[in-house]
Amino acid sequence: MKNLLYISALILVLFACKKTEVTTKAPPVSSNITEASTTSDSAANVFIYDAMKGYYLWADQMPSLSSTAIKLKPINYFYTLLYGYDTIDRFSWMDTSATNLTNQLNGINTVLGIKYSAFFADNTQTNVVFSISYVLKGSAAEAAGLKRGDFIYKVDGKQITVSNYQSILQNQTLSIELANYANGVYTATGKPFSITKTTLQTIPILKDTVIEWAGKKVGYLNYIQFLNSFDDSLRAVFNRFKSYKNSGIDELVLDLRYNGGGYVVSSDLLTSLIVKDLPSKVGTVMSKKVYNNAYTAVLRKEANSDQYFITNFKSESANLGKLNRVFILTSPGTASASELVINNLKPFMDVILIGEHTFGKNVGSFTITDSKKRWSFGLQPITFKTVNARDESNYGTVNGFLPDYLVKDNVIPFKPFGDPTETYFGKALSIISPVAYKANALEWRPTPRATQVNNLPLGDSRIMDRKEMWIEHKN
């Protein structure tokens, strides 16, 4: 077997994995990679082609090598190989730096540390405000005192408009001015402050809490990326849920509206922590992976078992055990590993989706780099499809999973996570106990709904919203 590729296969939805008890064993590297002798673009492209031919899920749909534009720059050549790029294959990508690619997949980014939505500031639909959805822990934004629900009104002294809102936060250091909001009017505070982007590790648990609601103990978890380095932190949250007031929580609301994926092993862990009656399921099928025909043959030859194709439930002491249902808050930002949790739970319990449709990514990847370090780029092509224990995987469309309860996240200002008056969480509580919700609603003043400019990722969100599912794959 030629030692030409370093393949990290992190079953992320994003899938990234660490060597823990839940790590999926990496499939072996195929031996069909052509060894190039030069560092020219053409040689790099031959390497890319052979790697894609060996591992790409749609390898059978690729053009012949001789018919490709072999002299293109590698970053351009890669995308010419994709099957139905941006329609069928909406997900494969390449970075000129494998280091940058790996850092992104592991939640290490240089950012302000905010996710935000753009809303029109007035009826002219010319001026724009950024409403902060969340602030990363340990970020420059948190240090500056920014929080969910704040409105960014000016940047570097300029009003945010439909002409500049997609690029106005690109500089490394920025002067930001917030706005107060009252009676449908935004008013600048007149107190700008400076903030500089920093490189930080995403801490994926934004909020976990338990509230008492109509005689029930309701657990709430907002989780924004599946990072295996935080698996023990996730277990700790569920241990708190399980032991709350001795008998544990009665209902779980899992907020994945901002979770674009991550490590498959971490997605599998979350599934195991939630699923009802885990002990009876240990050793049975949770999910399966489907590869291209050629790579399937390689894996079958490598192992006599289904270890590369089937993921079974594993024992987890923090499993909640008794829940008959789970409420999952979703949006178009709910993707890949997040959708994997939804799909894997559906055969075993009632999964109630609240919000908007999910992204629609039922496929994953592993990272391909040149182990001889002739080229520094990293490839992240789609290499497998996932199905659940019932062989279901029918959410791989632009509509993803449709919600059971459609809710728009456009009530401003955004309320804190875990607050009963917060739009998504409040809807879940209204289903848990409609009577209690109606009684409390009499005390809650209605808030206006804003008109969103679009739902495209902006600024930090472009970086933090990478939607992936991968498995770690090393030779």
For each feature predicted by the language model, list its residue ranges.
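Sec-dependent signal peptide recognition
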Residues: 2-8
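C-terminal motif of bacterial Sec signal peptides marking the signal peptidase cleavage site
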Residues: 13-16
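Flexible, low-complexity junctional segments that flank or bridge functional domains
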Residues: 18-251, 276, 447-475
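Flexible loop residues that form catalytic
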Residues: 157, 257, 331
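Active-site-proximal loop/turn and secondary-structure-junction residues that shape catalytic pockets
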Residues: 199, 258-260
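C-terminal "post-core" interaction segments
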Residues: 225, 230, 238-239, 244, ...
